[in-house]
């Protein structure tokens, strides 16, 4: 194997994101690791004679971004799916037209998936029915995935293939929407969409595993172009774990991928009594493919997250959960005893309390260094932040979703609920919580620049302010996309900051994300992306 040459990055504005937020002028990379961070003189004095020299002409260098909560295995199949994005599609007729046009070229009987549909963003403000989908996809089982990924809309062929009919009982954790006669309308909520999601995903993958690996690799290259050098897939099933194993074995993983393992389907009950489930979670890791963590969903998006509202001084509960409080407690405690790290999804304040109660029990019996993650906290009470901080919980937040979904979350919260805050990142930081920013892609953009901008600007797609008192600074946003998610992913000692001994996961940017104007932050461009000292992406002309 050819020995890697040392790399000197000089004439730079190096934002190390270390404990002191210190800056430097140069970095020496040797053997894929950061060797020296300091002045150009110090770096030149320690570099090998044949070292490569990269003069960045005053550009900013930061650690690679880490997206700790993403759904890469879902997003990878976008090129083979029907793009039903709303916007730019503005009416249901436009959505149906693009579906029909796509399906004309698909062999009969082959599954087709539609993506990025959001009913609240079209004129009709409704979902398509099975019969409308039958008309535009008459020869194929078709499944349109809601942009939230918590619902889907199927045609008759798809429903028939997975055995959903008038007499199908309601599944655990989900709902089959029915007409007055009891016949399914095609709308499937939460776990009811499991069979459709799994059947269509499995068909896409198993039809051609080699192509599936190439699609995954291509999506990872897209991520490199926006500066991602580490990603966590926040719902890995047995089949998507197989896809990752194949990609890793083929040398098609250009950065670290952490698997947060779920059940057999996207939303399905975790069963730690099954040896195959535990074996999958605890499967030996490779350098780039990591495991050892489990994802648990607590509350649902439909009818709404689990929220305790206050009306006339009395508490009212709205929303629904997948698990009861005792079930979450037992799952978390058992997982901890097995040595499994945890990432638990809690969107509303009631669900968050259930998660915190479970984590308090885990902390009583486990090592204080165990990483315990709360995913989302979309609608929370500011007082919950202090409890998170006391328990040492990592909050993985998604303020980028406020851009497209802000009005929906406001509706879910309810009127005159002053005790509830939307995406309360500022409050959580002030309480001492370690907060990471993450995309939840494909539910929202995967661009760290856009998500950091949303956290700083607190604006929706319509340009409306969304609780601007919860805004963070650009400096804080940078930490929340680098060192904090490194810790949440169990790799804080490996990466996330530019310090001697850490992996040389580095970005060269076209502007300083800390000092640029807020409006410019979302326009930030990555010029170069290095993973372990290897140049994995270079912007043309940079």
From Swiss-Prot:
Its cofactor is Zn(2+). Keywords: Hydrolase. Residues 1-2 form a propeptide. It holds the Pfam family Amidohydro_3. GO terms for molecular function: N-substituted formamide deformylase activity. Optimum pH is 7.0. Stable from pH 7.5 to 8.5. CDD domains: YtcJ_like (cd01300). Optimum temperature is 35 degrees Celsius. Inactive following 30 minutes incubation at 50 degrees Celsius or above, no loss of activity following 30 minutes incubation at 25 degrees Celsius or below. Little loss of activity following 30 minutes incubation at 35 or 30 degrees Celsius. Completely inhibited by HgCl(2), CuCl, CuCl(2) and AgNO(3). Partially inhibited by ZnCl(2) and SnCl(2). Almost completely inhibited by the reducing reagent DTT. Partially inhibited by phenylhydrazine. Moderately inhibited by phenanthroline and 8-hydroxyquinoline. Completely inhibited by the thiol-specific inhibitors N-ethylmaleimide and p-chloromercuribenzoate. Hydrolyzes N-substituted formamides, but not amides. N-benzylformamide is the preferred substrate, while N-butylformamide is hydrolyzed at a much lower rate. Has very low activity towards allylformamide, N-(2-cyclohex-1-enylethyl)formamide and N-(alpha-methylbenzyl)formamide. PANTHER family: IMIDAZOLONEPROPIONASE, PROTEIN LONG AFTER FAR-RED 3. Belongs to the metallo-dependent hydrolases superfamily. Homodimer. This is N-substituted formamide deformylase. The gene is nfdA.
């Amino acid at each position: 194997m050819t020995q890697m040459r040392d790399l000197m990055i000089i004439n730079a504005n190096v934002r190390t994101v270390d404990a002191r937020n210190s800056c430097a002028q140069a970095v020496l990379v040797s053997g894929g690791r950061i060797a020296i961070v300091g002045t150009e003189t110090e770096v030149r004095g320690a570099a090998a004679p044949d070292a490569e020299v990269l003069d960045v002409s005053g550009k900013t260098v930061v650690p690679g971004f880490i997206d700790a909560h993403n759904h890469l295995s879902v997003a990878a199949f976008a090129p083979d799916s029907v793009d039903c994005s709303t916007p730019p599609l503005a009416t249901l007729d436009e959505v149906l037209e693009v579906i029909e046009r796509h399906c004309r070229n698909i062999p009969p009987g082959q599954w087709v998936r539609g993506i990025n549909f959001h009913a609240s963003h079209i004129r009709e403000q409704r979902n398509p029915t099975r019969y409308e989908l039958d008309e535009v996809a008459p020869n194929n089982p078709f499944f349109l995935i809601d942009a939230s990924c918590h619902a889907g809309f199927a045609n008759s062929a798809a429903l028939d293939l997975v055995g959903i009919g008038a007499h199908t009982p309601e599944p655990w954790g989900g709902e089959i929407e029915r007409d007055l006669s009891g016949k399914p309308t095609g709308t499937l909520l939460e776990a009811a969409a499991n069979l459709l999601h799994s059947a269509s995903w499995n068909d896409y993958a198993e039809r051609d595993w080699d192509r599936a690996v190439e699609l995954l690799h291509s999506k990872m290259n897209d991520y490199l172009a926006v500066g991602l050098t580490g990603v966590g897939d926040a719902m890995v099933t047995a089949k998507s774990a197989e896809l990752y194993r194949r990609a890793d074995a083929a040398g098609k993983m250009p950065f670290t991928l952490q698997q947060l393992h779920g059940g057999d389907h996207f939303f399905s009950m975790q069963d730690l009594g099954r040896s195959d489930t535990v074996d999958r979670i605890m499967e030996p890791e490779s350098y780039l493919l990591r495991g050892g963590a489990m994802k648990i969903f607590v509350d649902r998006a439909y009818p709404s997250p689990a929220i305790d509202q206050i009306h006339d001084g009395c508490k009212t509960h709205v929303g629904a959960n997948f698990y009861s409080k005792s079930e979450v407690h037992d799952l978390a405690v058992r997982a901890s005893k097995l040595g499994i790290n945890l990432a638990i999804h809690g969107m509303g304040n009631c669900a968050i309390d259930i998660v915190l109660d479970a984590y308090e029990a885990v902390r009583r019996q486990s090592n204080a260094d165990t990483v315990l993650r709360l995913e989302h906290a979309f609608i929370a009470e500011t007082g919950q932040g202090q409890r998170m901080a006391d328990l040492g919980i990592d909050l993985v937040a998604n303020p980028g979703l406020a851009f497209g979904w802000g009005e929906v979350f406001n509706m879910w919260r309810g009127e005159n609920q002053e005790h509830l805050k939307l995406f309360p990142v500022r409050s959580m930081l002030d309480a001492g919580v370690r907060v990471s920013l993450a995309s939840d892609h494909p539910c929202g953009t995967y661009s760290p620049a856009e998500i950091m901008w949303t956290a700083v600007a607190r604006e929706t797609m319509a340009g409306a302010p969304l609780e601007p008192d919860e805004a963070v600074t650009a400096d804080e946003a940078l930490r929340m996309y680098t060192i904090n998610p490194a810790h949440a992913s169990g790799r804080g000692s490996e990466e996330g900051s530019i310090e001697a001994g850490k992996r040389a996961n580095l970005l060269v940017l076209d502007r300083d994300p800390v000092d640029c104007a807020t409006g410019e932050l979302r326009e930030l461009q990555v010029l170069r992306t290095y993973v372990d000292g290897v140049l994995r992406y270079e912007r043309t002309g940079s």
